Amino acid sequence: MSQQYNVAILGATGAVGETILEVLQERKFPVGELFLLASERSEGKTYRFNGKTVRVQNVEEFDWSQAHIALFSAGGDLSAKWAPIAADEGVIVIDNTSHFRYEYDLPLVVPEVNPEAIAEFRNRNIIANPNCSTIQMLVALKPIHDAVGIERINVSTYQSVSGAGKAGIDELAGQTAKLLNGLPADKKQFSQQIAFNCIPQIDQMMENGYTKEEMKMVWETQKIFNDPSITVNPTCVRVPVFYGHAEAVHVETRSPIDAQEVINLLEQTEGVEVFHGDDFPTQVRDAGGKDHVMVGRIRNDISHHSGVNLWVVADNVRKGAATNAVQIAEVLIRDYY
């Protein structure tokens, strides 16, 4: 019998946590015992996993020494509290929040881009999962960077409300229903009405005029590519779509590269689906439930001699969070456990 691993999911009742549960089953991850953890409020809720019923436990009462691997998606404050405790018990923590991403001695990993960085988990038994928008962009840009190098990235994102969790999904649904029935729309989760609207602010505003979400893309790109010379100029926009993020990516390369060569490279890249000609991916039609990154509208930039433009789409809850975390765990048990 192949080795099995006891897995804990912190934040099991959230959008990402529930999706991690699905992905573990779909990818047949070798789970021995499964521990679903959440706050006292969710204690006792049950889920089905591999034909069995699993009960949600109160994280405050959990013995971390029972787990080998833990997947965290319960928010930065809970990661800050519980990840070091779990790690001290020998658990390898894969954290979906931003809390540990920018610490120099912890790996920030996209398995298709920098799987070798996983080895750094030995520093503190913690691996950070990048921001959803960074993940899909870098999966698409990795082969270009390897081929000719990247100097600068201009990117505009069009991010669905599921990036704000279940509360974001509920707010879009509720506002849409009210407005279509002639009622005023209440806003709680977003700074402005999200139904039938676009909001060019995700996360808090920083002193430099960028949002924290935008600066995440800057910091994470440089760390994952291990190249602080790459400049990144993002604008992140929340759009009234339930699932899936899209990005208009404009890249300036160190050496010119033809669009057809980019297409050829991407067609050979693990985890990428290329759309050709006038066919292009969209969040609503293509992204939902997919674990890979979709790229279309690939063309040379008519305004720059070394420019390439791409349209990049992915399911932010899966590849942008849950699937990427499970893929990290797969590499971990294959190469390091």
Predicted regions mapped to residue ranges:
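N-terminal Rossmann-like NAD(P) cofactor-binding subdomain of oxidoreductases
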Residues: 1-194, 229-231, 293-294, 298-304, ...
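Charged docking surfaces used in two-component/phosphorelay signaling
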Residues: 70, 161-337
